[in-house]
Amino acid sequence: MQVHASLGRTHNPANVQRAVESVRSSGIPALNLDLIYGAVGETLDDWRYTVQQAVELSPTHVSAYGLTVEPGTPLALEPHRHPDDDDQADKYIIVDDILRSAGLANYEISNWAIPGFECRHNLLYWRQGDYTGFGCAAHSHADGRRWWNVRTPERYIEAVDTNSPTEASGETLDVATRKREALELSLRTSDGVPVGALDPKTLDGLVEVVGERIVLTQRGRLLGNEVSLRLLP
């Protein structure tokens, strides 16, 4: 509860339990839990207990993300509350070990699932599929072009009411950018990339060859940003 309060969250574990019971009683077979780690004041034991409690709810899918500080937020103005990289790395290893032991496979850096319950929505992003976003600030992608809608509900509603474009801006990706992004996104997943798509020596210790694929090691998953930087031309 103390960690929740530090992040401005008003829900509590009892709310989570009630929500899960509601999903189960409705006959919905798939259940995802979103977890965030790295808040100041959260010990390794606190985090381990959180993950163990999550496993006891028998989710079919878990997303676990390290806390990030966005510019312009109240947290950004308090550097002493910013997450510590080493602490986040330790907590990633904890969640990875516990979820794998519970039968949830890591199929993308921050996502674990019972086989067959991987998130198709997210897989579409990682495979550079096409999608259309509706609503304020929603993003879309088609044929190598990305665009996003106006940010505020008021502007979006006004645009719809006046039959005006809802798009705020966009960009068309060149061939080189699309290829690099395809490589980066594929490497985030457990499928990795085909042998020959890159030289493993450029990512020494961050990737390994498994059969005919090159996949991230656990260290590579911890250093995803470093992997992306090394793939830059």
Per-region residue spans from a language model:
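C-terminal scaffold of the Radical SAM
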Residues: 1-196
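Short amphipathic alpha-helical interaction segments
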Residues: 195-205
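A short, conserved structural fragment
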Residues: 204-212
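Minor-groove-contacting beta-hairpin "wing" of winged helix-turn-helix DNA-binding domains
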Residues: 213-217
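Short, amphipathic alpha-helical interaction segments positioned at domain boundaries
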Residues: 219-233
